[in-house]
């Protein structure tokens, strides 16, 4: 544990308060085990290239993890990968690719995006397909306890069997709509799917009730408990997951007799024109497209600058304002380095700690950082090098918690997007190979579809005598 962590307090003495969706209020964070924190973050369904809406949750809860770790907590942080899903199967089939190859390709894309933005790698990153045994065991427990039933190869959760169903989202049982469509095997259309019976051409696994594949809600429960146990501290994800996904996770865990998550944290969406950023709405901004406008550290600063529970309305003006703010911090630190000497990481301020302990109030924490920058610049201009160095050291400590310390070697080159673009090149080359195969078999529609998808992601393909070449599409700044 560092001296600066000891100065603020560690373990249960930290004073951290978090908004718990289940309670509908801010609560003191009291971990299940003193000095330890167990966190599960719902990760990506790897069906396509990540956009900034996808990675916001990664950035938001990376700050929580960094704050806990810096204050002496031993943090187990699990982020799953959903690598089997209707959308993955459909998109892979449309592209003429094996489903597992499609999922693995975009899993790498998400890993590259998280890494480009400085999100710490999780303690473990389980794939759904690697935990089928645990899912089957969970479903068997639910059937044995009378909370689930098999019908025609499918297995459903009996919503009416659980009196507290709807406690997270506040949905009354009469208002529940699972969004699964009508299924003939359901006893009640409010029931949700735990296991889907095998269909021709789809992957399947053997179970006591026949071959099939897992339902989305079952995947996360099994992986949570496999890595964190039947009860753990924090379950996190986007606010769009509150219902039905997280509600249905709770139903399964409680139906099986497990305590499950003690705190539920949800981040707000990234919006454009007031609408949630979504591929179905066509208003997404892929990570490669944004990284052609700003550096990775600047994008991280932007995504983390709003309170994690608030909506983050994307606009070019807001993005450039974040760039200007980050550059101001960076320039001050470089001024101190050039005039005074290298800047060590010092201690954060009490106001910064109070802000993060108040439900991760990053906007207030950033205000403290910019106040320190202003004071440091004044000190530097007046020749007070000691004060300037003190402020710079404090700023480094605070920016390090936010994951974007400009003097960290990850960002210091001022060209931190290069690694991300190398990762993008791997993905684009795979797409171009798929396009070439489609052209060879004269499937012009498939070839054009691949080219169009790349263009939507901000990548332009030009056919040359030496083969297809790609470049990032120039955007107006």
Curated annotation (Swiss-Prot):
EC number of the protein: 6.1.1.16
Cofactor note: Binds 1 zinc ion per subunit.
Protein family membership: Belongs to the class-I aminoacyl-tRNA synthetase family.
Renumbered ranges of motif 'KMSKS' region: 276-280
Protein name: Cysteine--tRNA ligase
SMART domains per the UniProt record, alphabetical: DALR_2 (SM00840)
Keyword Nucleotide-binding: yes
Gene, per the UniProt record: cysS
Disulfide bonds: none
Subunit text: Monomer.
HAMAP family for this protein: Cys_tRNA_synth
InterPro entries: Cys-tRNA-ligase, Cys-tRNA-synt_Ia_DALR, Cys-tRNA/MSH_ligase, CysS_C, Rossmann-like_a/b/a_fold, tRNA-synt_1_cat_dom, tRNAsynth_Ia_anticodon-bd
UniProt superkingdom: Bacteria
MF terms in GO: ATP binding; cysteine-tRNA ligase activity; zinc ion binding
Binding site for Zn(2+): 42, 220, 245, 249
Cofactor needs: Zn(2+)
One cellular-component annotation, GO: cytosol
Major location (coarse): cytoplasm
Enzyme class: ligase
Catalyzed reactions per annotation: tRNA(Cys) + L-cysteine + ATP = L-cysteinyl-tRNA(Cys) + AMP + diphosphate
Locations listed in the record: Cytoplasm
Pfam families in alphabetical order: CysS_C, DALR_2, tRNA-synt_1e
């Amino acid at each position: 544990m560092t001296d600066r962590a000891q100065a603020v307090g560690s373990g249960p003495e930290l004073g951290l308060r978090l908004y718990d969706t289940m309670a509908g209020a801010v609560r003191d964070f009291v971990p299940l085990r003193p000095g330890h924190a167990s966190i599960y973050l719902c990760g990506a369904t790897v069906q396509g290239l990540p956009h900034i809406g996808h990675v916001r949750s990664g950035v938001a809860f990376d700050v929580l993890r960094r704050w806990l770790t810096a204050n002496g907590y031993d943090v187990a942080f699990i982020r799953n990968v959903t690598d089997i899903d209707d959308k993955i199967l459909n998109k892979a089939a449309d592209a003429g690719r094996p489903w597992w190859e499609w999922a693995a390709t975009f899993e790498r894309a998400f890993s590259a995006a998280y890494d480009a933005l400085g999100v710490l790698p999780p303690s473990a990153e389980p794939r759904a397909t690697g935990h089928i045994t645990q899912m089957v065991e969970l479903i068997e427990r639910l059937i044995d306890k009378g909370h689930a039933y098999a019908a025609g190869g499918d297995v459903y959760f009996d919503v009416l069997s659980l009196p507290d169903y709807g406690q997270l989202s506040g949905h009354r049982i009469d208002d529940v709509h699972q969004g699964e469509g009508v299924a003939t095997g359901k006893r009640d259309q409010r029931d949700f799917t735990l296991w889907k019976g095998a269909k021709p051409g789809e992957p399947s696994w053997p179970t006591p009730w026949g071959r099939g594949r897992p339902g989305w809600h079952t995947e996360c429960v099994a992986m949570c408990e496999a890595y964190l146990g039947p009860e753990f501290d924090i379950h996190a994800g986007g606010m769009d997951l509150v219902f039905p996904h997280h509600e249905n996770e709770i139903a399964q865990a409680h139906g099986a007799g497990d305590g499950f998550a003690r705190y539920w944290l949800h981040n707000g969406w990234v919006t454009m024109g007031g609408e949630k950023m979504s591929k179905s709405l066509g208003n997404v901004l892929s990570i490669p497209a944004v990284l052609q406008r700003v550096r990775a550290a600047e994008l991280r600063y932007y995504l983390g600058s709003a309170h994690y529970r608030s909506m983050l309305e994307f606009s070019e003006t807001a993005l450039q304002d974040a760039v200007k703010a980050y550059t101001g911090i960076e320039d001050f630190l470089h001024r101190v380095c050039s005039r005074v000497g290298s800047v060590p990481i010092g201690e954060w301020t009490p106001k910064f700690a109070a802000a993060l302990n108040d439900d991760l109030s990053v906007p207030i924490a950033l205000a403290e950082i910019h106040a320190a920058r202003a004071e440091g610049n004044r000190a530097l201009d007046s020749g007070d090098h000691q004060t300037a160095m003190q402020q710079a050291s404090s700023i480094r400590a605070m920016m390090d918690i936010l994951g974007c310390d400009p003097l960290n070697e990850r960002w210091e080159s001022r060209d931190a997007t290069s690694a991300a673009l190398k990762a993008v090149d791997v993905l684009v080359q795979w797409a171009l190979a798929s396009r070439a195969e489609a052209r060879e078999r004269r499937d012009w529609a498939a070839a054009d579809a691949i080219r169009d998808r790349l263009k939507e992601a901000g990548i332009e393909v030009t056919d040359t005598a030496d083969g297809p070449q790609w470049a990032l599409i120039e955007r107006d700044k």
